[in-house]
């Protein structure tokens, strides 16, 4: 055989190892000579096709195992398939039939009926290559021939079969008669059921019992139709493959929906699962009583359903049409133990992508079982603490707050048994052991080899096999290459060890991962009665990690390859030892050169310094807060692990844990904890030493450790029991309580599938994918006692019940979140806010304030100062003031504009007083507080009667209550819209005000969304070669959603910690999304959890202030001087007249394209219907467009039916309170009605009666009942104010408007169309519009930009090409009646490159395209684009050198 052929065979064996089939010896005759002939990779479609040359066609079972294994192994890389090429293509009927189910199974996904037909029969085989199947009729035959025959033949071909032909024959008469009888029986039964239903309905009508939709509530178990007998056969949903005429199923309802049909009947649709699969159940109401009964069917009920299974063309899946539905008792797990345990190791969905059951469901289960306490121990995080605390209160449970931490030792030693030996002069015994496993206690050495090295030269060798006294496992043979024949008859361990000890003498021992090799050597020495080795030891693994921390990994084969050291056969001791020797000498020399290390006892001098924490291997430990001090220390440790010691995962150095141990209890955690590992690998003595550090010892049920047995880290269940018994003995010897914990990741055994899907979604990156996931559901006391029965009844009860409650009793009752609001304190804030407010009021309204002004100020200041909110106003004032001084307007959001104090302290421009005139000269004022005017901006122009100065017009008529509540005690939520350009400056300014240690970005937690979960489920279905029904997909998706995926930060939220406390009083701290290079740290808790405890400033970035600033810079016009009632501007909202174009020119009947809040198609349609002419009407429209069920099906109908006009409808939440007060309702009731309506809760009878009594129109009352959400008027007014200012420029300074729009708001351009004029733009718009829903997001964004470009062109302006010497990096420039686009408008040219071009041209003209590419850092693709667009005319391709 050639070397190339051998390589192909080796590749096949490597493939078998990669897919986990290296130990499958049953099929050795088929695989031993198999080769990978070629691999065809399609990068575009991400598919790999393996062409395998084999002696003969594989058995079907082997083909299936390989197919599944490959799909699983390469799921994150590509879709895989095999093309088998056998030397011998002999086939027979048995082989054809063996493969049949594999071949036709995929057909079931496309046609369940045909799939079932094919699956339920065996094809016959006719020579030479014909297969024959049976069908019922011509339709089935045609369907198979047209849709599936070619695929069946193709699939056989891929499995290595010769080209087959396929025939079909009709079932014989007896078979056909049987089929017809089935269909006839079904038809008769359906007719019988229909007749029975008619009789029942007639009987009800005769007895006058035809119920109404308001039927009496359910008093017993739910039942529609007939009673289903207890002994009726139940079919598993997982066994329903095709249409069935009459079956009974049962399951849990997990979704319900009732739809009212045009016919007046109701359609009940719900989904049930019995955890083998799920199904949609449908039922039509027969009368009003059925319709009323439908309302009683709830999610969470268990039901038994009888009916027929049909193929539903609408959902394209099998569904059941129910005839009878009976509620039944659900399946519940009970805890019948007299004394209950407490679970101390439990994960919530905050354990990232690893746990699925909600905190509420887990805590409810504990309470239902009668447990008194429960712990939370998520991986490294405390993010479930707030929810856990609430659930504990809800269910009466004591909550133990903890984490499962990644603990590390402070630097791992490079050297052991330190001795003052000169490294360059020493003799080294470099050795390696090959073993039967990883445990020095339970496994044995089978090969021991070493070399002696002096001055970099090998001077002696030692090599010996050791007979273990038993056959080697397949894993050992495959990993080491050592076979039974090689070790059989070799010297026993005691002989070899004595020889090795004598050979090694007192020389320095060296090994790669010395802790492993020395662990085996020393344990073996002790077993044969020898002392542990006292030699100086060097670990080349840790030395390499220290010297080269930037290497991706430090495995022996990686390092030898890096340094060109020969490693002939990795995992054979003799070859590993020799390679390690040359590596060690290289490392010793580098240690001297890089760190001046010359002696053995200096090797550990740098241990624990710098990035040493990155080199340490983390192990798990559970850390619990015992006291309030401990809770704060836990928060500090979590912060430290995320900020100072994050590397792949948050890490806690043992030294830091020791420093902050006060108030903490520490447990040994799971199989990844150091105590279990010590017992498994090093034995009792090592485990006892480890146990000294901990407060209690954890053991878990045997199934939790199952992956260790599967991966052969533990030999078998008996060996596992021995380890657990020994751990219990360690507890007895050390006096540490041993507690049985569950390592809970989900509530019930049936929930395991959700975790499997989540873990599978992470592919090879998650080590849990290396073995079958263990059973880690929440176990009852009974279940746990049964799991530990092997310890004896008494000991089992001690560790399950007694000790778990003992640990609970150690813990104080703790509250991880505060009850009160803690705002920062600024000395004199109250006086400053009061003085500012009155100062500005006097400046505007005169020395003697109008009564309405003074009353409003006093009312607000009393609430603001009385409840400690003055500091919040002062901080907001400082932020806004700085922005204004720096030249950027600030827009207010939310309801802050409802506060007159906010207006007077310049936090908002919105004035909430009733509409009024105000003289800027003599301070005279005139108020309209009767509701006759909607906005002061709508008042007609008027001169002051006292001094003749034109009046200013102000006031939006907004009650203060909508901001701070009726009692004025609601925490103010001041949202401010800063320019997007200025936002980082505003954020940084908060650090100046409060100090860096007291401000943090508001943290957020990103969880698995429904769409993402759907992808996970479908990928799992594909990779596991499954067919999952649609309803089952929905269930699995629901089970995977809500699990933490990542963390982030609120776009503008800044959390302020008062300086008389520190952040750990409220929350740990971390970086967003674990980005350790982030400029800001965030709160570890989601900001909603601490929203009511600390001040949150909403410093948001917005385009409007940026646009206003650019317009001001271009025009020199102060935006505050722009009139709010300009007639031409107001016309813009109802026609295109002000633009000088016709509606057909711009495909819009209004001129609001590009105007914030009014440019979308939806709002433009509202404008067309309502034809607003005033500012207050624009505020109405802003409110209507942002609310839910405020416009559609509500105000829209009222206006269309002429019930009322635009000013009269309910637009914003504040309108309700103001209108009702004007109608005569008491203000507190008016406020309650407003709050109820805006939250979608409708009206109570009391509210409705009061409204009717005060002559509130009935249409108004009905409108209130429909509303789900409402916009605050202050928010709407602030938005409209900005919109009107921008609209002013669109009408009167159009090129300023367009230059600003394209610079600030647009991201996607089609410069080719824009430069080529109106027809080109319209053609591109048509292309996008013709795509309809298929248009991409980028194309839809481009369409919006092109609409504005088309309008600009229609108004007589045009676009120039990008100009190499005129264009800006990132702003459109006005040039006469045209705009010059910036460089970053070129596709794929980023702003950084654009700035580079501008910087380069300032250093001189470009000599050539080559010069532009080099100096401007521009890609060839961009150069080509610019050349095609004519931007580089006259520029040669390359620099030219003239010699004369």
UniProtKB/Swiss-Prot annotation:
InterPro entries documented for this protein: DNA_pol3_alpha_NTPase_dom, DNA_pol3_finger, DNA_PolC-like_N_II, DNA_PolC-type_N_I, DnaE2/DnaE/PolC, DNAPol_HHH, DnaQ, Exonuclease_RNaseT/DNA_pol3
One GO biological process term:
DNA-templated DNA replication
Which Gene3D superfamilies does the record match to this protein?
1.10.150.870, 3.30.1900.20, 6.10.140.1510, Metal-dependent hydrolases (3.20.20.140), Nucleic acid-binding proteins (2.40.50.140), PolC, middle finger domain (1.10.150.700), Ribonuclease H-like superfamily/Ribonuclease H (3.30.420.10)
- Gene symbol here is polC
> Where does this one sit in the cell?
Cytoplasm
* GO CC entries: cytoplasm
Q: Which UniProt keywords apply?
A: Cytoplasm, DNA replication, DNA-directed DNA polymerase, Exonuclease, Hydrolase, Nuclease, Nucleotidyltransferase, Transferase
Q: Known EC number(s)? A: 2.7.7.7
Organism encoding this protein:
Listeria innocua serovar 6a (strain ATCC BAA-680 / CLIP 11262)
The entry sums up its family as follows: Belongs to the DNA polymerase type-C family. PolC subfamily.
Per the record's keyword annotation, is Cell wall biogenesis/degradation included, yes or no?
no
Q: Which domain of life is it from?
A: Bacteria
Q: What does this protein do?
A: Required for replicative DNA synthesis. This DNA polymerase also exhibits 3' to 5' exonuclease activity.
Q: What is this protein called?
A: DNA polymerase III PolC-type
Q: Which residues form the Exonuclease domain?
A: 428-584
Pfam families for the chain: DNA_pol3_a_NI, DNA_pol3_a_NII, DNA_pol3_alpha, DNA_pol3_finger, HHH_6, PHP, RNase_T, tRNA_anti-codon
Which GO MF terms are attached to this record? Answer: 3'-5' exonuclease activity; DNA binding; DNA-directed DNA polymerase activity
